[in-house]
Amino acid sequence: MATPMHRLIARRQAFDTELQPVKTFWILIQPSIVISEANKQHVRCQKCLEFGHWTYECTGKRKYLHRPSRTAELKKALKEKENRLLLQQSIGETNVERKAKKKRSKSVTSSSSSSSDSSASDSSSESEETSTSSSSEDSDTDESSSSSSSSASSTTSSSSSDSDSDSSSSSSSSTSTDSSSDDEPPKKKKKK
């Protein structure tokens, strides 16, 4: 690993070799080159972060190393915690809402069933009233037909037999209307 101290030592060694007599000049310069090359093997450039040359000798571009800051990491951790809490709260709220909806639906169905029961009882009482009124009307028609038949019998006997058949037909028709009203389901009244 190259430090400024290593650089100084390498320069001194190169300078010392250059001070030797000129006889061995060629021999002395070569070792200095070899020494500097040997030192460069362990030297790392601070610009491109590669071994083999000094920073001032670098011809490459500076490499960007992404080092996330501690504050950014802490912010991410806080956001994750907040998101987890929000998810848990939303899950809890949805569960509560589901329970509330179930309770509402149960209460609505029970109230609707009770209201339908009460409306059914109301309609049945109304149908009973209509059947009693129709039966009273039938009895009125029977009396009128019987009175007409009695007046007809005073005039002629043949007409009285005809009126008796008329009264019997009217009574049979009234019974058929009663039976049909009992078979049909009660009709609901429209509310205004």
Curated annotation (Swiss-Prot):
One of its GO terms (molecular function) is nucleic acid binding. Residues 109-136, 144-179 have a biased composition (Low complexity). Residues 89-192 are annotated as: Disordered. It comes from Homo sapiens (Human). It comes from the Eukaryota. The keyword Zinc-finger applies. This is Zinc finger CCHC domain-containing protein 10. A zinc finger (CCHC-type) spans 43-60. Keywords: Metal-binding, Zinc, Zinc-finger. InterPro entries: ZCCHC10 (IPR039715), Znf_CCHC_sf (IPR036875). The lineage of its organism: Eukaryota, Metazoa, Chordata, Craniata, Vertebrata. Coiled coil: none annotated.
